[in-house]
Amino acid sequence: MEIKLEQLGYCYQKNSPFEKRALLDVNVSFDSGSYSAIIGHTGSGKSTLLQHLNALLMPTEGKITVGDREIVAGVKQKKLRDLRKKVGIVFQFPEAQLFEETVEKDICFGPMNFGVSEEDAKLRAKKVIYEVGLTEEILSRSPFELSGGQMRRVAIAGVLAMDPEVLVLDEPTAGLDPHGREEIMEMFYNLHKEKGLTTVLVTHSMEDAARYAEKIVLMKAGTVLKIGSPREIFAKPDELVDLGLSVPDVVRFQGLFERKFNVKLTKTCLTIAELTAEMAPYLAKGGA
């Protein structure tokens, strides 16, 4: 499912003394089946933008098109349930939203709220619990008896049970250790490939943006500053640092190597294998 934002703008508490501009003239598209990342410093508008993708927020200017559904600023919208079934959002610390007596009931809540029968919802719960790396026996347990990592997977299963076509991830690994973060990100990537999802990742992790995204949207102060492939975005690391962002370790090490040997490698490397191959000729002859 394709998503397109055209001249999108948003103000909190518009036409009040407390009006605050959050988004201005945002133009970006996410192709069907693509994996994109949105990066930017805190307050750049990333989370506000993502809440427009399933109409949790409505634009105050411009429009957004999700599949065949068009949402135009100032036009009253009907039947947003259909849109919200198609666009699933995993927020930061999604486990905080768990509330039911059992894992099964928690996973079934979303689908049943959108009209799925209890029987079908339970079948979905059995399916998605395996997709998030857990087993069926956990369905009868209280979510509050689980570990933090298991609770997060259960919360994610609740989103997947809606059978979305678009998956929006808002810092989905916040608070996890490096191993847990890698496991969750690999799980999302596998789901993206297996289900043909359109995936949009909001992240502060430049490593994740470089590793998984086909396209990166760089935001600053509510506007889109730059759109490009990971190689294009990280080709000028100093610009990102000036914005208060980090760069992937491989990119940082490449910069150190280029300065030390006064050389310019032929491309911006995103993996250790790429960087090793690029450095090899210089190391073989002891420097440039």
Swiss-Prot record:
Signal peptide range:
none
Check the record and name the Gene3D superfamilies matching this protein: P-loop containing nucleotide triphosphate hydrolases
Q: Which PROSITE patterns match?
A: ABC_TRANSPORTER_1 (PS00211), ABC_TRANSPORTER_2 (PS50893), CBIO (PS51246)
Key word Translocase present: yes
Q: Which EC class does it fall in?
A: translocase
Predominant subcellular localization, coarse grouping? membrane
Q: Return the Pfam families for the record.
A: ABC_tran
Q: Where does ATP bind?
A: 40-47
ABC transporter domain segment(s): 3-246
Under which EC number(s) is this enzyme classified? 7.-.-.-
Q: How does it sit in the membrane?
A: Peripheral membrane protein
Q: Quote the SMART domains the UniProt record gives.
A: AAA
Q: Where in the cell is it found?
A: Cell membrane
Q: What is the top-level taxon of the source organism?
A: Bacteria
Which controlled-vocabulary keywords does the entry list?
A: ATP-binding, Cell membrane, Membrane, Nucleotide-binding, Translocase, Transport
Q: Name one GO molecular function term.
A: ATPase-coupled transmembrane transporter activity
What is a single cellular component term in the Gene Ontology annotation?
Answer: ATP-binding cassette (ABC) transporter complex
| SUPFAM superfamilies per record | P-loop containing nucleoside triphosphate hydrolases
Q: How does it assemble?
A: Forms a stable energy-coupling factor (ECF) transporter complex composed of 2 membrane-embedded substrate-binding proteins (S component), 2 ATP-binding proteins (A component) and 2 transmembrane proteins (T component).
Its job: ATP-binding (A) component of a common energy-coupling factor (ECF) ABC-transporter complex. Unlike classic ABC transporters this ECF transporter provides the energy necessary to transport a number of different substrates.
- NCBIfam families listed in its UniProt record: ECF_ATPase_2, PRK13634.1
| Membership in a protein family | Belongs to the ABC transporter superfamily. Energy-coupling factor EcfA family.
Q: What is this protein called?
A: Energy-coupling factor transporter ATP-binding protein EcfA2
